[in-house]
Design a protein with these regions (language model features):
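Long, contiguous binding/interaction regions
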Residues: 697-886
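Short beta-strand element of the conserved SAM-dependent methyltransferase core
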Residues: 522, 573, 692, 783, ...
Length: 886
């Protein structure tokens, strides 16, 4: 997430073209031509011994002879010279370099050279970059691009050229257009951090094929998407496509889970990609999800309705007042409804009257205008009239407008006019609905991610016991555990299992059945037979000793006949669950090569295909995230909403998924977990059959996860001056109600000192931003007092680090009636220790000169205090490295 050098790449003050040429079609010629034609304001320095000047610009024979050090260099020479030239640029002090081509054999040497000289690299095999607001075209793009508010980051030069060509025809602009190439150094997460703060960028579109660091990507994407919509198209969904692209991209459902967890939206194909570009370039942010449709034909409106229905969209309902105004304005044969079919004889005037009435109403959030070729309302004329009406209507800025001028030849000019006017326009009704639903789903994802999670009830975990059991199994050489062996591990995390024992033969099976009680089930134990059903290896509802003995012998006999070489480790004898009216589910944890552990929920089957049969989420899960997974499974028909007798207990299943998540997060030894079946019967969820694959684990437990989990190890009990003990711990999303209550007990004066303004009330969004933090980028510690199973917050301190993890901004707030207990100092000491251990160099903050308590505390803690009376602030800076030495 480093931002080092990105300013020199994306806003360079000078550029050197190494290998500049006067020969057309040479890379050095094309790069010089594009840089000069783009209108770059700074010096462009062609470097070539072959020419005195290139395109009228004085050339320099080599890098050493350059009159000053360029911010950015572009290597346009033969790839064999890359390493030597990069070394020269590094010695010259160049900050960034674009490498247009390099074989894989050079990658490690190029990376090492750049690191040695503190230089950043874009590429290799990069098309380059375009930054129209800087007049920068450091690319091979054959077409120029206009200024716009959309940033595009691509890992494919071919896709980049396609989008550029399409955008030129639509006269569509970009803030940045960056082709990453092989991402040897600069990667997508760093660019997301940069673009999130860029004032010229209002939306971001990504084309991705692979990731080098899933954790950094999810963290950066989650941060950026809180302020700007980000859409992703990901290729390589099939194994064949991954082989073609030569990538190890991981499981496609894992990408869906990561994209959703980060608050992004995925588009599935090139058609959706073009619609997404149109939408992000021109469409206003949605206020809600209610859509109003007007058309001059029933059939196009019906196609739009079908597309809306298939994506679970929502039609607006018109008020009676709006309906009456439309009846008064339109011919009597027009039925007032939504969609509003103006009929094929509708004139441009009918469109404008309808538009005016609808824009004055508040019955919808987005308006879709469909126009089919018509003699009564020619396409171009209707578009011109509509554009003027929208331009001058006082309420047009409050509504998201989408236009769909059907047809090709007759509507081409109309679509050009809409693009020039900044109104999103699409070729088909279905494409328009797709674009609308992109923004609805993005808005919905963001809203869901900010909801306050419920506190799960009776959530227990015994991490130490689970670790001990796993370590014992590994020490004994086990690599896979079955239901009997996994039972105590699941129970340590509060999950229900049935009494299960191992029998070596039919006689022992009868003995165990007598002990645990009838009816029982018998299940084959064999590592060589993946599906017990292949040999009828599961026998249910055995009610007598005779039935148990016969069933056991029959299982052994079938194995000998069908799988004579199979190893048999006896039978599992298990109490028979009451399956009447119950529902069978499957919960699987797989390890993805890119995103780490994945939690999958479905109904299973012999042939388990997660992409078709399961919904997927990244751990860690809280109750909200688990609930979304369950609801997603129901909506996508991966699981049923009810069994024959009763509905599925969504809250109960969500809690079980949280328990599974906690187990996986706490126990890195677990490689795979398969609970199948999981029996859902009312509020009871029971694991009937479980397989657990394990292996030794060394290293950082958290590093294997794509999302950093809650850091339990930072919890600490602290005794205050009055002898009271309170818990210092990282903040949780579930803390929102307690945080709101805490703020209500802070005086207005103290809040003013903290926020530099009078704040009457914090919104849910404000509180969500304070509690739902990314522990990789931010840390907030709360001091908590526990009273009768409830918690109240006494104080909060937080630090937000920059993307380079060098500086962090800090703040501290203590309940006004609890000052003098040393709470603020203890919280600050904990924050200082954490930020220093986290590798930060400086801790910065500001307060007001009359906040004497904070100024005095800062001095005691070793901060440099800079009182700026003219500005009315006090700057506070702590050098963490110096403090550690002292």
């Amino acid at each position: 997430m480093s931002q080092r050098g990105l300013e020199a790449l994306l806003r360079p003050k000078s550029i050197a073209v190494i290998g500049a040429s006067m020969k057309p079609n040479r890379a050095g010629y094309l790069m010089m031509r594009n840089l000069l034609a783009g209108g770059f304001n700074g010096p462009v320095l062609p470097v070539t011994p072959a020419w005195k000047a290139v395109l009228g610009v004085l050339a320099w024979p080599d890098i050493a002879s350059l009159p000053f050090t360029p911010d950015l260099a572009v290597l346009c020479t033969n790839a064999s010279r890359n390493l030597a030239l990069l070394e020269e640029l590094g010695e010259k002090g160049c900050k960034t370099c674009i490498i247009l081509s390099a074989p894989a054999s050079q990658h490690e040497d190029l990376r090492a050279c750049a690191l040695r000289h503190n230089m950043r690299l874009l590429g290799p095999n990069s098309l380059g970059l375009l930054a129209p607001w800087q007049g920068l075209n450091a690319s091979f793009s054959p077409v120029p691009i206009k200024r716009g508010k959309l940033a595009f980051i691509s890992q494919s030069a071919a896709v980049s050229n396609t989008i550029l060509d399409w955008a030129q025809q639509r006269k569509m602009g970009f803030s940045y257009f960056i082709a990453l190439g092989d991402s040897l150094d600069i990667d997508v997460d760093e660019l997301l951090d940069y673009l999130a703060r860029d004032s010229k960028t209002s939306a971001i579109l990504l084309y991705l094929e692979q990731l080098s660091d899933a954790r950094r990507f999810v963290s950066a994407a989650r941060s950026a998407s809180r302020n700007k919509p980000i859409l992703v198209i990901k290729s390589g969904r099939s194994p064949a496509a991954q082989r073609l692209l030569n990538t190890t991209a991981g499981m496609d459902p894992a990408w869906d889970a990561a994209i959703q967890r980060a608050g992004l939206l995925r588009v599935q194909d090139t058609h959706e990609l073009f619609s997404a570009v149109e939408t992000l370039s021109h469409m206003r942010p949605l206020r809600g999800d209610r859509l109003m449709i007007i058309s001059n034909g029933a059939a196009p409106a019906a196609l739009a309705l079908d597309a809306l229905w298939s994506r679970n969209g929502k039609l607006a309902t018109l008020s009676e007042e709006t309906c009456q105004k439309l009846r008064d304005a339109l011919p009597g044969h027009v039925a007032i409804s939504n969609p509003l079919d103006l009929r094929d004889d509708a004139s441009s005037e009918h469109y404008i009257k309808t538009l005016d009435i609808l824009l004055h109403s508040q019955d919808f959030d987005a308006l879709m205008v469909i126009h089919s070729p018509s003699a009564a309302a020619p396409a171009t004329e209707s578009a011109q009239v509509l554009i003027e009406a929208v331009k001058h209507h006082p309420r047009s800025k409050y509504v998201s407008l989408l236009t769909n001028w059907c047809g090709e030849h007759s509507s081409q000019e109309a679509r050009r006019l809409f693009s020039e006017a900044g109104l999103p326009t699409y070729r088909t009704p279905e494409g328009t609905i797709t674009a609308f639903m992109h923004m609805v789903e993005y808005r919905r994802n963001q809203k869901q991610l900010r909801e306050t999670p419920a506190l799960p009830s009776n959530l227990t975990s015994n991490t130490a016991e689970a670790h001990l059991l796993l370590q014992q199994a590994i020490a004994e050489g086990a690599t896979s555990l079955d239901t009997h062996e996994v039972q105590p591990i699941l129970q340590a995390y509060g999950m229900n299992t049935l009494p299960t024992r191992i029998a070596s033969d039919s006689t022992e099976a009868v003995h165990i059945a007598e002990q645990i009680g009838y009816p029982v089930a018998l299940k084959l134990r064999s590592p060589d037979i993946p599906h017990k059903s292949e040999v009828q290896g599961v026998m249910l509802y055995l009610r007598t000793a005779n039935e148990v003995q016969q069933a056991a012998n029959a299982i052994f006999d079938r194995v000998k006949m069908a799988w004579p070489q199979a190893r048999v480790h006896g039978l599992l004898v298990q109490s028979m669950a009451n399956r009447a009216g119950a529902q069978e589910l499957r919960v699987v944890v797989e390890h993805d090569p890119v995103f780490g552990p994945l939690i999958m929920l479905g109904e299973g089957g012999v042939e388990w295909r997660p992409e078709d049969q399961a919904v997927v989420a990244l751990p860690p899960l809280n109750m909200n995230l688990a609930r979304y997974l369950v609801i997603q499974g129901i909506k996508s028909k991966k699981i049923r909403a009810r069994s024959a007798l009763r509905p599925l207990d969504v809250a109960g299943l969500s809690q079980l998924l949280v328990q599974v998540s906690n187990l996986i997060v706490d126990c890195p030894e677990i490689q795979r977990l398969d609970i199948h079946p999981l029996l859902a019967s009312g509020s009871e969820f029971t694991a009937l059959d479980v397989t657990l694959d394990i292996s030794p684990f060394e290293g950082d437990n958290e590093s294997r996860l794509a999302v950093r989990p809650y850091p339990h190890q930072l919890e600490e009990w602290v005794e205050l001056k009055n002898g009271e003990r309170c818990l210092f711990r990282p903040i949780l999303p579930e803390d929102e109600p307690q945080l709101q209550q805490f703020i209500s007990r802070v005086t207005k004066e103290d809040l003013y000192y903290r926020y530099f303004s009078e704040i009457n009330e914090f919104t849910h969004e404000d509180l969500a931003n304070m509690t739902q933090i990314d522990y990789d980028r931010e840390m907030a510690f709360v001091a908590v007092r526990r009273i009768d199973q409830t918690e109240e917050i006494l104080g909060v301190t937080r630090a937000i680090s920059d993307p380079d993890n060098i500086d962090a901004e800090f703040a501290v707030l203590v309940r006004s009636d609890l000052k003098g207990l040393g709470l603020g100092r203890r919280l600050m000491e904990k924050l200082i220790t954490y930020t220093r251990d986290h590798g930060l160099q400086r801790l910065n903050g500001i307060t007001m000169p009359n906040n004497r308590g904070m100024v005095a505390l800062a001095r005691k803690l070793g901060f440099n205090v800079d009182i700026q009376l003219e500005e009315g602030i006090v700057g506070l800076t702590l050098n963490l490295a110096q403090r550690e030495e002292s």
